[in-house]
Amino acid sequence: MVKSPGTEDYTRRSLLANGLGLTPPMGWNSWNHFRCNLDEKLIRETADAMVSKGLAALGYKYINLDDCWAELNRDSQGNLVPKGSTFPSGIKALADYVHSKGLKLGIYSDAGTQTCSKTMPGSLGHEEQDAKTFASWGVDYLKYDNCNNNNISPKERYPIMSKALLNSGRSIFFSLCEWGEEDPATWAKEVGNSWRTTGDIDDSWSSMTSRADMNDKWASYAGPGGWNDPDMLEVGNGGMTTTEYRSHFSIWALAKAPLLIGCDIRSMDGATFQLLSNAEVIAVNQDKLGVQGNKVKTYGDLEVWAGPLSGKRVAVALWNRGSSTATITAYWSDVGLPSTAVVNARDLWAHSTEKSVKGQISAAVDAHDSKMYVLTPQ
């Protein structure tokens, strides 16, 4: 039940009422690969591929349109209008199709006068109307960007859409995208289900690693219902090696980031599928305890990331950011285990288990690669 504004419960966590985001969202978004080149055929084919390739069964449920899906101007009633040339059937028909596959449809708007592409209107001043439109179409997720915002603080603009979505009559996941500018981790849990902590990612090692670091400092603010978002996945887009993409996916999973695929899944190669479909890594991301793992130890370019899981287990990643193979060691004292603990160590990428490990775990890790483990006390 939604409490009325002003009551303590409402102030503390207004969006618990939508019941969404108890684990980080999983799915796909059009922006990283397609930018403004999206149409209803692409969205339908992506939904088909999500199911036929087995990704939907692994938890990838959201099929999200990003910028450029609407006409430049609203209609005579002030409503957003899907672009006739690219979405001739309209968004409701598209949502119906996506829902028929057992998936959910996401859409995009902006807390400003226009979206970032300037090819369609933003929702500033139209929040109630647009939220009702999205609900009437059967939309399940809204990414809400931060361009052309008239220099009004996001702390003022985003709660208006948050309340509009709560009043829309439909449960809609609310993804804040103000790029971490006003430290949303400190205030957005009352407003949305996820919040970007960084500027946009691009498909490069330097961008990916810097997003991971920027996101990491906010780890303590994440939890069920509200997640830090270091931006969408670049896995499969070609700008990094398979090794680097493995690190990207491992750290995003450990950090409880939204796992939103950003490549063309219709034509992804086997290596990309192997990364995105690792059920053991996904299980770390989706663990019901919902504690964001973080960087616990650094030895120059060698890093240990770790976080607790349900059942007294611990997830650990050994990440080599250097240019040559090196041995990385995680000591129990660094990862939150009692020094006397004896664990079974499951290697999530090799799919093998080492039994009765004491005190520490070490591995030789190739340049830019990572090893990922779940440690289960005996």
Swiss-Prot record:
GO molecular function, one term: alpha-galactosidase activity
Disulfide pairings: C36-C68, C116-C147
Entry binding sites for substrate: E178, W179, G180, E181, E182
Keywords: Disulfide bond, Glycosidase, Hydrolase, Signal
Record-linked InterPro entries: Aldolase_TIM, Glyco_hydro_27, Glyco_hydro_27/36_CS, Glyco_hydro_b, Glycoside_hydrolase_SF, Melibiase_C
E.C. number: 3.2.1.22
Catalytic residues of the enzyme: D145, D200
Gene3D superfamilies according to UniProt: Aldolase class I (3.20.20.70), Golgi alpha-mannosidase II (2.60.40.1180)
Entries under Pfam families matching the protein: Melibiase_2, Melibiase_C
Reaction(s) the record says it catalyses: Hydrolysis of terminal, non-reducing alpha-D-galactose residues in alpha-D-galactosides, including galactose oligosaccharides, galactomannans and galactolipids
Uses in biotechnology: Used to convert human blood group antigens of type B into type O, the universal donor type.
Superkingdom of source: Eukaryota
Membrane-crossing residue ranges in chain numbering: none
Record-level GO cellular component terms: plant-type cell wall
Listed GO biological process terms: carbohydrate metabolic process
The keyword Zinc-finger belongs to this UniProt entry's keyword annotation: no
Entry-linked SUPFAM superfamilies: (Trans)glycosidases, Glycosyl hydrolase domain
Annotated signal sequence range: 1-15
Family recorded in the similarity comment: Belongs to the glycosyl hydrolase 27 family.
Function: Preferentially cleaves alpha-1,3 and alpha-1,4 glycoside linkages. Involved in the hydrolysis of the galactomannan, it splits alpha-linked galactose moieties. It is particularly suitable for the hydrolysis of guar gum to a gum with improved gelling properties. Can cleave terminal alpha-1,3-linked galactose residues responsible for blood group B specificity from the surface of erythrocytes thereby converting these cells serologically to group O.
Protein name as catalogued: Alpha-galactosidase
Record organism: Coffea arabica
